[in-house]
Amino acid sequence: MADFLAPKSNTHATISSRFQRVQAEGRLALMPFLMAGDPDLETTAEVLLSLEQSGADMIELGIPYSDPLADGPVIQAAASRALASGTTPARVLQMLIDLRGKLSIPVILFTYTNPLFNRGMERFCDEAAEAGVAGLVVPDLPLEEAERLSPLASARGLDLVLLVAPTTPAERMARIAESSRGFTYLVSVTGVTGERSVMEDRVQSLVQQLKLSGSNPVAVGFGISGPQQVRQVRSWGADGAIVGSALVKRMAAAAPGLVAQEAGLFCKELRNAAG
């Protein structure tokens, strides 16, 4: 593929404006995750549009990486399929450029530090902003490195979203909540991504703790497998629910040509549970 092409200014909604809209409607923000390039970027583009049409408020889009330490087997397999189809960060960004004018909800890139540092933090942020990306999630980025990246991202209109785990010490949790932009990402389980039939009850108290620690909305991810967990997250007082492995699994099981349709049907089920 040709080198990255820079388009005109960002036309997507911001993360903050979307949360404000959702909160005004008195419901939970639905934030599906999918892996870019699984099974190919053409299908990814179709799924992104289907998710928006089916009620998604924001979309977390994974950039495939060969050693995804935070991901469970479902998303690892999706990353492997995406890499096998020739997906690269540049191609993912070009796909988003091609969707300009069609996709209006915020897109948040989920990437590991290796692709980010290989491209260079400033260059990566420049290109993400030009592609209309609203934010970044970098799960293996230490807080100290995040404090270097966040100003670079903010200067380009990107929110660097930071993660908090159930095992994060209270003092560090407060620092993360204060430093995160857009929202604070609360990991609901200890371990890697993946569906869980039951989520830890302690997460409910962590939601409230994070809300007291900063002004950001709190979105819960990792382990949300369906509408029941979405309703549970809503009852805890969280502002958003991120659903990844369950959606990726549904897409992988769909018949060729029906992936976007299947993703949209599942998204509608989740949106109904979100309020």
UniProtKB/Swiss-Prot annotation:
Pathway: Amino-acid biosynthesis; L-tryptophan biosynthesis; L-tryptophan from chorismate: step 5/5. Keywords: Amino-acid biosynthesis, Aromatic amino acid biosynthesis, Lyase, Tryptophan biosynthesis. It comes from Prochlorococcus marinus (strain MIT 9313). It catalyses: (1S,2R)-1-C-(indol-3-yl)glycerol 3-phosphate + L-serine = D-glyceraldehyde 3-phosphate + L-tryptophan + H2O. Its EC number is 4.2.1.20. This is Tryptophan synthase alpha chain. One of its GO terms (cellular component) is cytosol. The active site is at 60 (proton acceptor), 71 (proton acceptor). Gene3D superfamilies: Aldolase class I. NCBIfam families: trpA. Signal peptide: none annotated.
